[in-house]
A protein has these predicted regions:
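Conserved AAA+ ATPase small/helical "lid" subdomain
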Residues: 164-213
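AAA+ P-loop NTPase catalytic core and its hallmark functional loops
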Residues: 1-180
């Protein structure tokens, strides 16, 4: 993942809820030490304002006020996390198509052919997370054209042993008994969630890391 990011490839981390997709991106961020911008596309209600910006008037003059996304994609070697892209509004997907296309790499400010275009700076890397699996329900299926603009990294929910190994690697100074307890409880909630309909939330890998830290 780090080598792909260094080459400017777009990465999509896919997997069921709780498997540590966002945390994996954060680890890549720490390793690369690049300017970072986080966007939760799953909670975005107004894609045009969030991704492009707004037209505003002042003393009879109309001007364009760019979004923070527009500003960040003009900074070389920035990393942009498009979190929960699978839950995003389809309009957000359409806006991002040219941004993520390696042969285009621009953001069109308006639908008009003559509208201004904002070029994506060199070295900008886009990462995204997408939920899949039986625990993910949505009326939307992620656009195939958008998905093809990413290199897909498939992730699975960690088992108890793998989670314990991860925690001991991240927290070598924490007592192993504590880390073992966290990994065991997390694994048990995930197992129970598969067979018990009353359990609708699991302890995610991110939450395990937070408890350990």
């Amino acid at each position: 993942a780090i080598r792909s990011a260094l080459r400017g490839k777009n990465l999509m981390f896919t997997g069921p809820s709780g498997c540590g997709k966002t945390m994996a991106v954060m680890e890549v961020r720490k390793a690369l030490k690049r300017p970072f911008h986080y966007m939760n596309l799953g909670s975005t209600q107004d894609p045009r304002t969030t991704l492009i910006g707004t037209r505003e008037a002042d003393d009879g003059t109309t001007y364009f006020k760019p979004s923070s996304f527009v500003n960040v994609i003009q900074n070389e070697n920035s990393m942009v996390l498009l979190d929960e892209i699978s839950r995003a509004h389809p309009e957000a997907w359409n806006i991002l198509l040219t941004v993520l296309d390696p042969k285009q790499r621009y953001l069109q400010v308006d639908e008009a052919m003559e509208a201004d275009k904002v070029s994506v700076a060199d070295g900008v890397c886009f990462m995204s997370t997408a939920n899949i699996g039986t625990d993910y329900t949505s009326a939307r299926t992620i656009d195939r054209a958008l998905e093809e603009r990413f290199t897909i990294i498939e992730m699975e929910v960690l088992g108890r042993d793998d989670e314990f190994d991860l925690l001991t690697t991240l927290f070598p100074n924490v007592e192993e008994e504590k880390l073992d307890t966290i990994a065991t409880i997390a694994a048990e909630t995930r197992r129970e969630a598969k067979i018990e309909s009353k359990i609708n939330r699991i302890i995610s890998t991110r939450q395990s890391v937070q408890m350990a830290g």
